[in-house]
Regions:
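A structural signal for isolated positions on well-ordered beta-strands in alpha/beta enzyme cores
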Residues: 4-6, 29-31, 56
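A conserved acidic beta->alpha catalytic loop
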Residues: 34-45, 62-65, 92-93
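Conserved donor nucleotide-binding strand/loop of the catalytic core
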Residues: 51-68, 72
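Short, acidic, metal-binding catalytic loop of nucleotide-sugar glycosyltransferases
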Residues: 20-32
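Short, conserved alpha-helix that lines the donor NDP-sugar binding/gating region
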Residues: 42, 46, 66-81
């Protein structure tokens, strides 16, 4: 069983080295499309690829972001896949998988074609900034992020390979999806990591929306500061995993 993971990045040098190294634990290939990074993300991934053949810097795309960018990598590598293999159809640079991904996928019933993630969505709080606990170095700050959104989000992440899968550029995922597995795979999601990163995220997404990307409709705030939360509205979590986390959660 192979797992090919499809990653689109833009200006995520603060986290992508850690998340891609983590994804290489369970991915046979991490196939990367860079959407015009200017912060050294692409160069970092190329340097990592020199030492790790699982990392494939596939292409650099300077045009406007659109939801079907990953379809380009899917089309280029689908001939390497066979029945029994899996696609991570959306690997995000700010997501970490603490469980045993291959073991979970092997446990999925044969008739299920899609597996969702269930994410712990970490946030930066107003109190974090007031207490000045963050250094701006995500590797150092990750254990200091102790609050997450109260609701667990589920989104498609893995699809079983089939020669009948079709992925058009206007689609977010390949079709047909088929049956969705009851098991979901846990993900630690760090979409907010520092003030500088939140400012950059806000600017990039506003630009993408203005260019008609067809995504980020939830990004409706007036400034990056609307990413911040109050601790009273969040759930406190233990951020240190010991890899004893169960690999799946029942829906």
């Amino acid at each position: 069983m192979k797992i090919y993971s499809l990653l689109v990045v833009k200006d995520e040098a603060d986290v992508v080295g850690l998340s891609v190294a983590d994804a290489c634990r369970w991915s046979d290939k991490v196939i990367v499309i860079d959407n015009g990074s200017t912060d050294g993300t692409w160069e970092l991934l190329q340097a990592m690829a020199d030492d790790n053949p699982r990392i494939v810097p596939f292409m650099r795309y300077e045009g406007p972001f659109h939801i079907g960018l990953r379809s380009k990598a899917f089309a280029a590598f689908r001939r390497e896949m066979h029945l029994g293999d899996w696609w991570c159809v959306r690997l995000d640079a700010d997501e970490f998988y603490p469980g045993d991904v291959p073991a979970l996928l092997r446990s999925i019933p044969w008739y299920c074609r899609t597996v969702k993630k269930i994410s712990t969505d970490y946030v930066i709080t107003h109190e974090d900034l007031a207490e000045n606990i963050l250094s701006g170095d995500f590797a150092a700050d990750r254990p200091r992020l102790h609050y997450c959104l109260p609701d667990k989000r589920r989104e498609r992440r893995f699809m079983r390979h089939s020669p009948f899968l079709v992925w058009l550029a206007r689609w977010r995922y390949p079709h047909p999806w088929g049956f969705v597995a009851r098991q979901s795979i846990p993900v630690d999601h760090y979409q907010y990591r520092s003030v500088e990163q939140m400012q950059r995220r806000y600017a990039n997404r506003q630009q993408a929306k203005a260019e008609g990307c067809g995504s980020f409709s939830h990004e409706s705030g007036a400034s990056w500061q609307e990413y911040l939360r109050h601790r009273s509205d969040c759930t406190a979590v233990n951020t240190m995993h010991d890899n004893g986390l169960p690999p799946s959660v029942e829906i």
